[in-house]
A protein has these predicted regions:
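Active-site beta-loop-alpha junctions enriched in small/polar residues
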Residues: 1, 34-40, 69-70, 94-98, ...
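Active-site-adjacent beta->alpha loops and helix N-cap segments on the catalytic face
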Residues: 1-23, 43-48, 68-83, 163-169, ...
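A structural motif corresponding to the C-terminal end of an alpha-helix
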Residues: 22-29, 59, 144-155
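Active-site mouth loops of central-metabolism enzymes
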Residues: 30-48, 125-139
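Conserved, mostly hydrophobic/aromatic
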Residues: 56, 60, 93, 156
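Catalytic-face loop-and-helix region of soluble metabolic enzyme cores
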Residues: 94-151
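Conserved small/polar residues in nucleotide/adenosyl-binding loops
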Residues: 180-182
């Protein structure tokens, strides 16, 4: 992850595809790269963004993990576009369990992620009710995982934002358990 550049620092001289190439020259690392179902905010177009992902994969990336999204259809369309573009690595969906809708909206605005109207309505009136927000957010994330699973997705990436409890509870509810808890 590049992170946010300091103001006035200009564009980077090196890109992710360059880093993948360099790493593959050192050793056969297992490399995941970023992908953007709703297009990277700095991309000139959806096609340019897709070609950038293709360059990263052609350089040796083993898989792509997407930016978080809330519209499952945007991920499915993106996955189809990847296949059509000859991108033959797994496209792992990034799931952001929302416990703070205002914060999620801020993240979404910065990253070109659309928040569906139905989702905003689900959080409406919950500004002062953190527990209910967590339940709503967990249910949305679980529904997304269930739909994506039915569409053939096997692996998921959860954005925990350094708060793993909610993702742990989601995984537990979906039947994903650590080996120590299944014996």
């Amino acid at each position: 992850l590049r992170g946010d550049l300091p103001p006035g620092s200009g564009k980077p001289e090196m890109y992710a595809s360059d880093l993948v190439t360099l790493l593959k020259e050192v050793a056969d690392f297992d490399i995941s790269v970023a992908a953007y179902p709703e297009v990277h905010p700095e991309a000139k177009s959806a096609q340019a963004d897709l070609l950038n992902l293709r360059r990263k994969v052609d350089a040796g990336a083993n898989r792509a993990i997407t930016q978080f999204f809330f519209d499952v259809e945007s991920y499915l369309r993106f996955r189809d576009r990847c296949v059509s573009a000859g991108i033959d690595v797994e496209i792992i969906p990034g799931i952001l369990p929302v416990s703070n809708f205002k914060q999620a909206k801020k993240f979404a605005d910065m990253t070109n992620v659309r928040i569906p109207a139905w989702m905003a309505q689900m959080f409406d009136g919950l500004d002062d009710d953190a527990e209910t927000r967590k339940l709503v957010g967990a249910n949305i994330a679980m529904d997304m995982v269930k739909i994506l699973s039915r569409e053939g997705v096997k692996d998921f990436h959860f954005y925990t934002l350094n708060r793993a409890e909610m993702s742990y509870a989601i995984c537990h509810t979906l039947g994903v358990r650590s080996e120590e808890h299944t014996s």
